UniProtKB/Swiss-Prot annotation:
Protein's organism: Arabidopsis thaliana (Mouse-ear cress)
Places the protein is found: Cell membrane
Gene: CSE
Name listed for the protein in its UniProt record: Caffeoylshikimate esterase
Substrates-to-products reaction catalysed: 5-O-[(E)-caffeoyl]-shikimate + H2O = shikimate + (E)-caffeate + H(+)
GO terms for cellular component: endoplasmic reticulum; Golgi apparatus; nucleus; plasma membrane; plasmodesma
GO molecular function: 2-acylglycerol O-acyltransferase activity; caffeoyl-CoA: alcohol caffeoyl transferase activity; hydrolase activity; lysophospholipase activity
Taxonomic classification: Eukaryota, Viridiplantae, Streptophyta, Embryophyta, Tracheophyta
Top class in the EC scheme: hydrolase
Family: Belongs to the AB hydrolase superfamily. Monoacylglycerol lipase family.
Domain of life (superkingdom): Eukaryota
Tissue expression notes: Expressed in vasculature of roots and leaves, stems, flowers and siliques.
Enzyme Commission number(s): 3.1.1.-
A single BP term in Gene Ontology: response to oxidative stress
């Protein structure tokens, strides 16, 4: 005979499944239309695996330029990250985004990035395919990276011919790992003794980054409900590679010669504002902009209260619109 506790559990209503999208149950096409954009989804084949990709095009008006966006660690392009894509598209830009290898609906071991040059090259293959296509080849083109996607974006820039891109945009990029987020050298050394066998192990300490990234509690709930979000421990090879590649980009900031915009919040608990400050100080670009937002957390657009996110978006819009006017298209 079932106990009282078991009977209560059996009679309790089932937890409803999460909505199919961050905005709820409104059909996708209807929602995107309400935001003034047209969305399409597809897969892009590369030698390193298949990438899930999305485009966000303005419903009306002439396209000013193209923006190629990369998301952060454990995230993907199909949840709240779309808010960034849709914002730029509503300003008149054709936006293209891809789930990084090992993320979302792209191929690869979940959140394993033992070779970030390969991760960057794979997304770059898709971005350059679009960038060089007839509708877009003569338009201004910008790379955009958020958080760890900023690191991947900078690696893509280093892998590209100088004239490929009009400008770079970063939101809380990961170029410097905060001391309290750095992996233990003892752990990395111990796992290194296994000759690479431990590289894909999800065995590194987890600092629960999402709670340090999102200020707005309601948005935190929405982001935490993302079915594609990686929630396991960091993988050994990923953390080792992040240490290597953050050091690499710090040593090569001077190779950045095109216009750059970078932004950080002073209360960022995931990446530190030093990342943006160092890029701004060391980049060789004659045209560079640094924005530091007092009291804002890591996720400047997806996770801040709306009034804060609007401040950031306004600054980004003014910057990119000004660059398009200043540098124009290749045929201008």
């Amino acid at each position: 005979m079932p106990s009282e506790a078991e009977s209560s559990a059996n009679s309790a209503p089932a937890t409803p499944p999460p909505p199919p999208n961050f905005w709820g149950t409104m059909p996708e096409e209807e929602y995107y239309t309400s935001q003034g954009v047209r969305n399409s989804k597809s897969y892009f084949e590369t030698p390193n695996g298949k990438l899930f990709t999305q485009s966000f095009l303005p419903l009306d008006g002439e396209i000013k330029g193209t923006v190629y966006m990369s998301h952060g660690y454990g995230s993907d392009t199909s949840w709240m990250f779309q808010k960034i894509c849709m914002s730029f598209s509503s300003w008149g830009y054709a936006v293209f985004a891809a789930d990084l290898l090992g993320h979302g609906r792209s191929d690869g071991i979940r959140c394993y990035m033992g070779d970030m040059e390969k991760v960057a090259a794979t997304s770059l293959a898709f971005f350059k395919h679009v960038r060089c296509s007839d509708p877009y080849k003569d338009l201004p083109a910008f790379l955009f990276g958020e958080s760890m996607g900023g690191l991947v974006t900078l690696l893509m820039y280093f892998q590209s011919e100088p004239e490929t891109w009009t400008g770079l945009m970063f939101s809380a990029p990961l170029f410097v790992i905060p001391e309290d987020m750095k992996p233990s050298k003892a752990h990395l050394f111990a796992y290194g003794l296994l000759f690479g066998l431990a590289d894909t192990w999800a065995a590194m300490p987890d600092n629960k980054m999402v709670g340090k990234a999102i200020k707005d509690p309601e948005k935190l709930k929405i982001i935490a409900s993302n079915p594609q979000r990686y929630t396991g421990k960091p993988r050994v090879g990923t953390m080792r590679e992040l240490l290597r590649k953050t050091q690499y980009v710090q040593e090569n900031f001077g190779k950045v010669t095109i216009p750059v915009f970078t932004a950080h919040g002073t209360a960022d608990g995931v990446t530190c504002p030093t990342s943006s400050k160092l890029l701004y100080e060391k980049a060789s670009s004659a045209d560079k902009t640094l924005k530091i937002y007092e009291g804002m957390y890591h996720s400047l657009i997806q996770g801040e209260p709306d009034e804060n996110a609007e401040i950031v978006l306004k600054d980004m819009r003014e910057w990119i619109d000004e660059k398009v006017k200043k540098y124009g298209s290749k045929t201008a």
